[in-house]
Amino acid sequence: MNIKSLLLGSAAALVAASGAQAADAIVAPEPEAVEYVRVCDAYGAGYFYIPGTETCLRVHGYVRYDVKGGDDVYTGSDRKGWDKGARFALMFNTNSETELGTLKTFTELRFNYAANNSGVDGKYGNETSSGTVMEFAYIQLGGLRVGIDESEFHTFTGYLGDVINDDVISAGSYRTGKISYTFTGGNGFSAVIALEQGGDNDGGYTGTTNYHIDGYMPDVVGGLKYAGGWGSIAGVVAYDSVIEEWAAKVRGDVNITDQFSVWLQGAYSSAATPDQNYGQWGGDWAVWGGLKYQATQKAAFNLQAAHDDWGKTAVTANVAYELVPGFTVTPEVSYTKFGGEWKNTVAEDNAWGGIVRFQRSF
């Protein structure tokens, strides 16, 4: 065998061996393209697409720290020192488009810590009102909303003023289970109808331990609103199925200028009782009013006053100052006069209190 034949045979053997090994080798798949998070600007700032879906998600919330001193303007009692509390609120919004309209969800979790004084020697550190709660959780498709939310008796007219102690004279209960439908026209007109489970006493002052319905008949709320560039006017009527009584509110807002606005709200209840879920003010009627002046881009002045049929008067003023974007400091002072039928329910007729709120929103 000559050298040429030997070399050709060796080369053929090597080719055959390498071909056999290649047949047994594992071929790595091509790497999949990475899907980065995409911004979703269809519903406002802060939304992004959940990867692999067409659903937009927003995560936001705030961290808050309150320092209170003076009297408790809700009860008239002396705090005897500082009361302090903190809250971390975490909120989730989802939005997506369907053939029946926009499908939305909203959830809010609150982590609370509150500590007050002993009430005897003013020593700080008595822990109260601490814990974690799922404050809201609802689903909305078009105008239909189901879940845990605030009562339409509060939200449809626009709450009260932009002050912290806004409900010294309560305008009704807050959180409730509900099924509601809101119609929004293209001409500024809107209407709402809601079937509600009743509040959980987070907005009341006396009376029953809760305001939940006690059978299959829900509370019923209905309202009408008209809004334009000048402001808005809204009215709501609510039926309490437990005590079979009703309450109503009418509110008007007027924008005097781009910086200055005023509002006035009146309410009437068919039953002057603290067991009324909606008419939680004292007596048959109550009135609230206020103003807001945006002094600068960073500072806003807010004032609110209220009076009810049983003789309670409450006045609150604050200045909300945004130190830097997302961080606001709000000093507030409040005064309550317990007159008329309220006079015998408190130790002191007059209560002065102050609060400073530090809040970082994100």
Curated annotation (Swiss-Prot):
GO cellular component: cell outer membrane; pore complex
Name of the protein: Porin Omp2b
A molecular function (GO) term: porin activity
Membrane topology recorded in Swiss-Prot or TrEMBL: Multi-pass membrane protein
Functional summary from the UniProt entry: Forms passive diffusion pores that allow small molecular weight hydrophilic materials across the outer membrane.
Entry domain remark: Consists of 16-stranded beta-barrel sheets, with large surface-exposed loops, that form a transmembrane pore at the center of each barrel. The pore is partially ocluded by a peptide loop that folds into the pore lumen.
Gene: omp2b
Assembly and oligomerization: Homotrimer.
Compartment(s) of residence: Cell outer membrane
InterPro entries from the UniProt entry: Porin_alphabac
Gene Ontology BP term (one): monoatomic ion transport
